[in-house]
Amino acid sequence: MSDLHFSGVVLPGGEGEFWVSDGAVHLSHPGTTGPWTELRGYAVPGYVDAHCHVGIVSDGEPDLVRGRALALEDVAVGVTVIREPGSDLDTSPLDGQPGLPRFVRMGRHIALVKRYTRGLGEQLEDPSGLVAAVRRRAVEGHPWIKLVGDWIDRSVGDLAPLWPDDVLAEAVAVAHDAGARVTAHVFGEDALPGLLAAGVDAIEHGSGLGPDTIEVMVEKGIGLVPTMIQIENFPSIAEPAREKFPTYYRHMMALHDRRKATFRAAWEAGVAMYAGTDAGGFNVHGALPREITALAAVMPPEDAIAAASWRARQWLGFAGIDDGAPADLVIYDEDPRVALAHGGLPAPSAVVVRGALA
């Protein structure tokens, strides 16, 4: 633990000061003698990477040693909470380790055989098995459950939904009855109506959103993690399929080309959006500043920061810079809102995770 005293601008408010002692934030002097490490500048509640896989790697096999190293790469840019939407590696032994972020896990993805990345997640033989798979996740105690909502169907040569609407509705109800929330990977348009009607709590990616589905998202308060820097990878994802599945290729390219317009429309309509990098596959760890910068192309800079900070923390049940709250902080020498408006976030001058300087 570190004894810290901060003075400066405290986002999302204004000028202020606080102390960190025994791992917690104190808005008045806690009465301890110190010595105090002085911090000045701009304080932001610790960042959340709302779509980050430390248990998935693009090469070799994941393990806890590597997972820990990857999490530290995220901490270095200010990430103090990782929402991990699917992992075959149980990363729970990393919980509570000094210097590491807090985790919100979902267990393994739920998909269908030949309808997701080979070897990743639980891949069912038949859609009718979804309800039982969701029940297993709920019994495991995960606060969220991740479904693969669409993927290429090679029999039609394009993105297509994995699950019948009635099965989805029953599966989501089972999760909710157990106190779990449900999110779904969706690239295209066709899977969205069934997922939204079933009452999922969030959509990952969401590049196929349009006026009707955006309206439903707003009405139902369904969150969106657009993973904008992952959508930037669509050309390289689709290229290997260009000749064999030309319809899929053109579809993915169209989703890519209109991505900013799609997410700007979602933001302007009032969809709650959160920052996530999809690190662990195509994207490297420590990329959250890039995702925040991408979000700032479709919403105001302060809202892009909020999507990775205080709004994301509230969404997942974590406190901000509040009296008595666990101290997770990012400190900047310059105003991150101004820097973001001029092209990108600066490097933090300090990161505090679990009450200690990282």
Walk through the language-model features, giving the residues of each:
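Distinct, well-ordered alpha-helical segments
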Residues: P93-Q97, L192-G199, T293
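Active-site core of metal-dependent hydrolases
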Residues: S155-A261, A269, Y274, A279-F282, ...
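Divalent-metal coordination cores built from histidine and acidic residues
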Residues: L64-A178, I222-I231
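Hydrophobic faces of well-ordered beta-strands that scaffold small-molecule active sites
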Residues: G46-C52, I82-E84, F103-G107, I145-L147, ...
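N-terminal metal-binding scaffold of metallo-dependent hydrolase/deaminase domains
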Residues: M1-P35, Y42-V44, D335-A339, A356-L357
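His/Asp/Glu-enriched, well-ordered alpha-helical/loop segment
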Residues: D177, H256-D335
